[in-house]
């Protein structure tokens, strides 16, 4: 099973994918592209390591990084990708990809990340 799509930096709700993660599933995610969290230079999916955390949705990733939620989980850093990754056993649901920024400040963001997700059963 696979999913391919765009994650817009100005979409605060994130991009829901067609991938449903079940405990034990093995996924690989690859991300590329350029996006900006305001009138600044653009960054890749790893985000801007120099920007301070001023209330980001994911405190474990840099501002402008690609992160995800699985079902009702907390945010999980993705950055440029994850290879053959397995989530904790209590995580289950649809994968939503999100640009890491401060809630309520997405309106001045621009750009996007192209993302591919592959899923294998463990």
Swiss-Prot record:
Report whether S-adenosyl-L-methionine shows up as a keyword of the record: no
Q: Name one GO molecular function term.
A: carbohydrate binding
Record keywords: Cytoplasm, Lectin, Periplasm
Coiled-coil parts of chain: none
> Any idea where this protein resides?
Cytoplasm; Periplasm; Cell surface
Concerning Pfam families, the annotation shows: PA-IL
What the entry lists under Gene3D superfamilies is as follows: Galactose-binding lectin (2.60.120.430)
Q: Which GO terms describe its cellular component?
A: cell surface; cytoplasm; periplasmic space
List all disulphide bridges recorded for this chain: none
* Predominant location: cytoplasm
Q: Which GO terms are recorded in the biological process aspect for this UniProt protein? A: heterophilic cell-cell adhesion via plasma membrane cell adhesion molecules
Which domain of life does the UniProt lineage start with?
Bacteria
Which family does the entry's similarity section mention?
Belongs to the LecA/PllA lectin family.
Primary role: D-galactose specific lectin. Binds in decreasing order of affinity: melibiose, methyl-alpha-D-galactoside, D-galactose, methyl-beta-D-galactoside, N-acetyl-D-galactosamine. Similar to plant lectins in its selective (carbohydrate-specific) hemagglutinating activity.
Q: What is this protein called?
A: PA-I galactophilic lectin
Q: Which gene encodes it?
A: lecA
